[in-house]
Amino acid sequence: MPNWGGGAKCGACEKTVYHAEEIQCNGRSFHKTCFHCMACRKALDSTTVAAHESEIYCKVCYGRRYGPKGIGYGQGAGCLSTDTGEHLGLQFQQSPKQARSATTSSNPSKFAKFGESEKCPRCGKSVYAAEKVMGGGKPWHKTCFRCAICGKSLESTNVTDKDGELYCKVCYAKNFGPTGIGFGGLTHQVEKKD
């Protein structure tokens, strides 16, 4: 603080900061209106600020600029972004192996293309999130999520799948389970002799 009146200089705009409008961070003073991320201009507070030397950033921009880089250093779901950090002055570099794998796909039909929805294996119509039930690794309509033989409505606890079709446990056991004496209700009865 200067000896002869006034206040400290703002770390962002270099103008005088008076006590009523002052926010301190990392030993520097800022106006409340100047306390923004230096990269994305998002308003900051004491819980969202990350300081680096004389610069202040939101935690996302700080992580992109100064955080660890490479595979395995993602920040949860936030790392699943197409943002390459160019607005931060960062350049994205792919290794030759990554570039080759990005251009070739081992199974292009496994995922729906952007803007398309997944198709129900039973009726072939689009399956939307509100009516989606997963079974056998595929999306089904709730109304189509039935046993292929008896038509019984299925749940995740009583579903079995074979060759892309769904079955209740009873029908699966009768049609695809072990067979012979002692299985599936067939028993060998021995008659008693008197």
From Swiss-Prot:
Q: Which residues form a coiled coil?
A: none
- Modification type Phosphoserine: residues: S95, S153
Q: Give GO MF terms, alphabetically.
A: actin binding; actinin binding; identical protein binding; metal ion binding; structural constituent of muscle; telethonin binding
Localization: Nucleus; Cytoplasm, Cytoskeleton; Cytoplasm; Cytoplasm, Myofibril, Sarcomere, Z line
Q: Which GO terms of type biological process are on file?
A: cardiac muscle contraction; cardiac muscle hypertrophy; cardiac myofibril assembly; detection of muscle stretch; glucose homeostasis; inflammatory response; insulin receptor signaling pathway; intracellular calcium ion homeostasis
Taken from the UniProt entry, a GO cellular component term is: nucleoplasm
Per the UniProt record, one Pfam family is LIM
At which positions is motif Nuclear localization signal?
64-69
Answer yes or no on keyword Zinc: yes
User: Has the keyword Metal-binding been applied to this entry?
Assistant: yes
Q: Fetch the CDD domains from UniProt.
A: LIM1_CRP3, LIM2_CRP3
Give the region (Interaction with TCAP) as residue ranges: 1-5
Using the record's annotation, list all stretches that form the LIM zinc-binding domain. 10-61, 120-171
Keywords, in A-Z order: Actin-binding, Cytoplasm, Cytoskeleton, Developmental protein, Differentiation, LIM domain, Metal-binding, Myogenesis, Nucleus, Phosphoprotein, Repeat, Transcription, Transcription regulation, Zinc
**Where is the stretch described as Interaction with CLF2?**
94-106
Check the record and name the PROSITE patterns matching this protein.
LIM_DOMAIN_1 (PS00478), LIM_DOMAIN_2 (PS50023)
Q: What is known of its domains?
A: LIM zinc-binding domain 1 is required for self-association. LIM zinc-binding domain 1 and LIM zinc-binding domain 2 both are required for optimal actin-bundling activity. LIM zinc-binding domain 1 mediates binding to MYOD1. LIM zinc-binding domain 2 mediates binding to SPTB.
Subunit details: Self-associates. Oligomeric in the cytoplasm and monomeric in the nucleus. Homooligomers preferentially form along the actin cytoskeleton. Interacts with TCAP, LDHD, MYOD1, MYOG, ACTN2, NRAP, MYF6. Interacts (via N-terminus) with GLRX3 (via C-terminus) and PPP3CA; GLRX3 and calcineurin compete for interaction with CSRP3. Interacts with CFL2; the stoichiometry influences F-actin depolymerization and possibly two molecules of CFL2 can interact with one molecule of CSRP3 resulting in the highest functional impact; the interaction is stronger with phosphorylated CFL2.
| Function comment | Positive regulator of myogenesis. Acts as a cofactor for myogenic bHLH transcription factors such as MYOD1, and probably MYOG and MYF6. Enhances the DNA-binding activity of the MYOD1:TCF3 isoform E47 complex and may promote formation of a functional MYOD1:TCF3 isoform E47:MEF2A complex involved in myogenesis. Plays a crucial and specific role in the organization of cytosolic structures in cardiomyocytes. Could play a role in mechanical stretch sensing. May be a scaffold protein that promotes the assembly of interacting proteins at Z-line structures.
> What name has this protein been given in UniProt?
Cysteine and glycine-rich protein 3
Q: Which gene encodes it?
A: CSRP3
